[in-house]
Amino acid sequence: MSDPLLFVLLGPTGSGKTSLSIALAERFGGEIVNCDSVAVYRELDIGTAKPTHEERESVPHHLFDVLPPTEPMTAGEYARRAREVLKDIASRGKLPIVVGGTGLYLRALLDGLFAGPERSEELREHLRRREQERGPTYLHRILSRMDRVAAAKIHPNDAAKLIRAIEVCLAARKPMTELWQQGRDPLTGFRILRIGLDPDRPALYDRINRRAAEMFEQGLVEETQALLAKYGRIGGPLDSLGYRQAFELLDGKLTREQAVAAAQQGHRNYAKRQMTWFRREPEVRWLKGFGDDAAIVGEAMQIIKTS
């Protein structure tokens, strides 16, 4: 008896993954598993472009809204939870459909991650203080000297990931990328089918620009204001794209027009980094279009039927 099928849908932000995943889930009796590092958090709705309540009612969705924004979700913890969900879905005879754009989460889920050293709160606090003293790019410059490959994969403003990478390099006394291949625990028990969305770049950027502007129109600043009142400046998911620019607007550092433009630019840059990461994924069947194009939906369905 062959292993059950696991369908993985990759693609940059704005490429129509949600639309395609729901169409496939409805057609093949599937259940959708989130693989986005910000969508796991409750109360962050407008800035994450999560599936709507109506979309979530049409087919089962998993690993959305599972944590408050004060609790960190590491890639390893995500992989542990997601593997449990995948096994449960498959045990009920349903098709698990992993959807998302966070490359590190996907790698942790499918390939496993090395067991890194324990966290050092003393070192972390020291690095946070140094960043405050020397500016927002300080941590990225430090990591670039220790591990250029890791630094290239982490956004210069993502302090949490930069601190963890520096911590690992110092504890192991070698670049973190050398450790990534050690002690991994790849996912077994599934036939993995990967499909990636690769829409026309100018058309994708146009969609990204429109969606980022719509987030502000739909109340992103007000949502950010409510999160600030409830949790304070906690960083983490509240430092993600959109929310970061909303904070700068609230602080008076940007006008509304500037905040929208900065969010648009940030999302475009993020889409470019996502595609760079996903191009390194093995055995991906790339579809040249958006996930809500009828031709792309039909092509994806045909691939699943013959797998």
Swiss-Prot record:
It catalyses: adenosine(37) in tRNA + dimethylallyl diphosphate = N(6)-dimethylallyladenosine(37) in tRNA + diphosphate. ATP binds at residues 11-18. Its cofactor is Mg(2+). It comes from the Bacteria. Keywords: ATP-binding, Magnesium, Nucleotide-binding, Transferase, tRNA processing. The record marks 102, 124 as: Interaction with substrate tRNA. One of its GO terms (molecular function) is ATP binding. Transmembrane segments: none annotated. The keyword DNA-binding does not apply. Its EC number is 2.5.1.75. SUPFAM superfamilies: P-loop containing nucleoside triphosphate hydrolases. The keyword Nucleotide-binding applies. Substrate binds at residues 13-18. GO terms for biological process: tRNA modification. Residues 36-39 are annotated as: Interaction with substrate tRNA. It is an enzyme of class 2 (transferase). It holds the Pfam family IPPT. Belongs to the IPP transferase family. Monomer. Catalyzes the transfer of a dimethylallyl group onto the adenine at position 37 in tRNAs that read codons beginning with uridine, leading to the formation of N6-(dimethylallyl)adenosine (i(6)A). This is tRNA dimethylallyltransferase.
